[in-house]
Amino acid sequence: MTTFIQNPTQQLQLRKLTGRIGAEISGIHLSSELDSSTVQFIHDALLEHKVLFFRGQQHLGDTEQEKFAELFGSPVKHPTVPAADGTDFIFELDSQKGARANSWHTDVTFVDAYPKISILRGLIIPETGGDTTWANTETAYEDLPELLKQFAEQLVAVHSNEYDYGGPKQNVEPEQLERLKKVFVSTKYETEHPVVIVHPETGKKSLLLGHFFKRLVGFSQSDSQLLFNILQEKVTRPENTVRWQWQEGDVVIWDNRSTQHYAVNDYGDQHRVVRRITLAGEVTTGAHGLKGKTTLPKDLSAEQLEKAKLHAVLNAN
């Protein structure tokens, strides 16, 4: 189904890509100069479709990507990885530097107020391969049997940046992976999140899992993994997913509070570079009001704590 939206400056077309997640918007030139009605349309479409795809945005450079992102919230840096050279907030994923995630995850869930929105721009795209798949974590929750919903709502999971990027990867030299991991876990983070969270804007429930997951509070590692596998499998079922074949100049925006994604590492030694900006989110809230809580790092100095508090205030929405 294609929806046409008219405004004084451009005619937008929105086309759903699957029954449960994803829509492509065309007829738009992304920039920081978008009028308020267009920004509102994109925001509302994002809440409904979870992931929005835009072709042909080659004009969008690093600076303009950062300015465009500010229309939807406050950009935040990655907690451990420095911003790309010449930028304030951009997180670069370069396959030649070992950045091949190749796992299902929600961005930066190892902190309590993880990003609400991610905006990804394709710079160098392989001729073949290198797609990204997104999954709808709200419909995954909705598909659970009632008793399993009730059980999941009682669970609390520990998320850590020691996980996900620490796993084995194809087409990545061990030395590259070790360098990447050292940067990624230069400060160790652990955060406890409810497994079922409530979206702060829509009020809908979803499953917060992905491969930053470490264990469930109160369960052994083996039992944690068994329960994780049961719930994670619901997220990644084909009917909950959309797969995007990248072209250079594409921009993808997703609601990081109701999705997981997976960058497919199937492009061998071809070069792939994408650049991401994330927007400040809120501390998670569970189905029964429990809040997310960061438990590590604990060894921050008083000065570091004050800086962290100031950073949180400056980036609050």
Curated annotation (Swiss-Prot):
Binding, substrate: H78, V108
Cellular component annotations (GO), alphabetically ordered: cytoplasm
Domain of life: Bacteria
Keyword vocabulary terms for this entry: Dioxygenase, Iron, Metal-binding, Oxidoreductase
Cofactor(s) needed for function: Fe(2+)
Spans traversing the lipid bilayer: none
Binding site for 2-oxoglutarate: T132, R272, R276
EC code: 1.14.11.-
Signal peptide bounds: none
Family to which the UniProt record says this protein belongs: Belongs to the TfdA dioxygenase family.
Oligomeric form and interacting partners: Homotetramer.
Name of the molecule in the record: Alkylsulfatase
Organism: Acinetobacter baylyi (strain ATCC 33305 / BD413 / ADP1)
